[in-house]
């Protein structure tokens, strides 16, 4: 059993917890949660969720600890990860999901506190290696601190890999139409660095930057410098969609591209890349554990070398499931 600690019980921290209990119960045991909020409120936020519904299990607080389905989970409220004493709960892996400790230097405080490995649930801000499960996880070589990249990179990388493997990508532009996240404002408010990002999400489509496309070059070096992209933040609570437009080296019809995606979804990328031929919309993918679901009916091509492909992702649930998958990978080495 892999013992996992979670630092930061926000959207991703809670979804990683739920995924571990629901889909990885035979492999992963959550042994500790560090968050500055009090125990009763952490239990409440785990139990009830506006997007994903009620937690399927028993949740209680006892003597300052969280009790979930009879299992005791240590709760702490430390600002500094160096004080977390992960050795006391034998943490094999710590999921760093506060969004604050995204360099080797800062995340290493978990190692100093007794954790064996650390997964950042966001792109690293330094040279910490990034992994996308299903795309480059087999190249993991025992590093004690890794990044699970972003939810958007986890959606984009599988389809980019299939396109490049089968047809070759000369260059490409990505747009993600992205659901709202916790950093956004419900009404207009101050945002010094990103003025547009300070506008209210309830009534705006907000153009934003994203490093997700460039990050694909880190998990697939063959595509380094060939992709870039942007985001539109939209007034939905969950599920986002990647629109990737590429110039291909080899000529390909949309039927051939669809066939390549379907083959990959049933083969090497099964469980990571999904495939649909249905007339779907975003809420149809809420709760889907695949990180990228290719929409065969949404893609278009201008000619045999210029095509647009579309892939959906539950930016909370799909991503969090792959954090758990990567925890299994790094705990095994």
From Swiss-Prot:
GO CC annotations on file: cytoplasm
Compartment(s) where it occurs, according to its Swiss-Prot or TrEMBL record: Cytoplasm
Active site (UniProt): 151 (nucleophile)
Reaction(s) catalysed by this chain's protein: D-glyceraldehyde 3-phosphate + phosphate + NAD(+) = (2R)-3-phospho-glyceroyl phosphate + NADH + H(+)
Keywords: Cytoplasm, Glycolysis, NAD, Nucleotide-binding, Oxidoreductase
Amino acids binding NAD(+): 11-12, 35, 79, 121, 315
GO molecular function, one term: NAD binding
Pathway(s) of this molecule: Carbohydrate degradation; glycolysis; pyruvate from D-glyceraldehyde 3-phosphate: step 1/5
Biological process annotations from GO: glucose metabolic process; glycolytic process
Name by which UniProt lists this protein: Glyceraldehyde-3-phosphate dehydrogenase
Lineage: Bacteria, Pseudomonadati, Bacteroidota, Bacteroidia, Bacteroidales
């Amino acid at each position: 059993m892999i013992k996992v600690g979670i630092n930061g019980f926000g959207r991703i921290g809670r979804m990683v917890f739920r995924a571990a209990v629901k889909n990885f119960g035979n492999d992963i045991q959550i042994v500790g949660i560090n968050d500055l909020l009090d125990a009763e409120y952490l239990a409440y936020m785990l139990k009830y969720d506006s997007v994903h519904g009620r937690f399927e299990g028993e949740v209680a607080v006892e003597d300052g600890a969280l009790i979930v389905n009879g299992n005791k989970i240590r709760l702490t409220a430390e600002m500094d990860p160096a004080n977390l004493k992960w050795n006391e709960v034998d943490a094999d892996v710590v999921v760093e999901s506060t969004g604050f400790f995204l360099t080797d230097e800062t995340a290493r405080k978990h190692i100093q506190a007794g954790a064996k490995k650390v997964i950042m649930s966001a792109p690293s801000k330094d040279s910490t290696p990034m992994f996308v499960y299903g795309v480059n996880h087999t190249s993991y070589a025992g590093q004690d601190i890794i990044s699970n990249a972003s939810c958007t990179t986890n959606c984009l990388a599988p389809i980019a890999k299939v396109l490049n493997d089968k047809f070759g990508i000369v260059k490409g532009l990505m747009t993600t139409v992205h659901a709202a996240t916790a950093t956004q404002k419900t009404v207009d408010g101050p945002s010094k660095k990103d003025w547009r990002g300070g506008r209210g999400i309830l009534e705006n489509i907000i153009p934003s930057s994203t490093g997700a496309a460039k990050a694909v070059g880190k998990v697939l070096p063959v595509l380094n410098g060939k992709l870039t992209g942007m985001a539109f933040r939209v007034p939905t609570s969950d599920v986002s969609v990647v629109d990737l437009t590429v110039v291909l080296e080899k000529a390909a019809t949309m039927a051939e591209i669809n066939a390549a995606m379907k083959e990959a979804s049933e083969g090497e990328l099964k469980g990571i890349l999904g495939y649909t031929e249905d007339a779907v919309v975003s809420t149809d993918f809420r709760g889907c554990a695949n990180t990228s679901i290719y929409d065969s009916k949404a893609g278009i091509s201008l000619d045999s070398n210029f095509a647009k492909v579309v892939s959906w992702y539950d930016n909370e649930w799909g991503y969090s499931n792959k954090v758990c998958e990567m925890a299994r990978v790094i705990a095994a080495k």
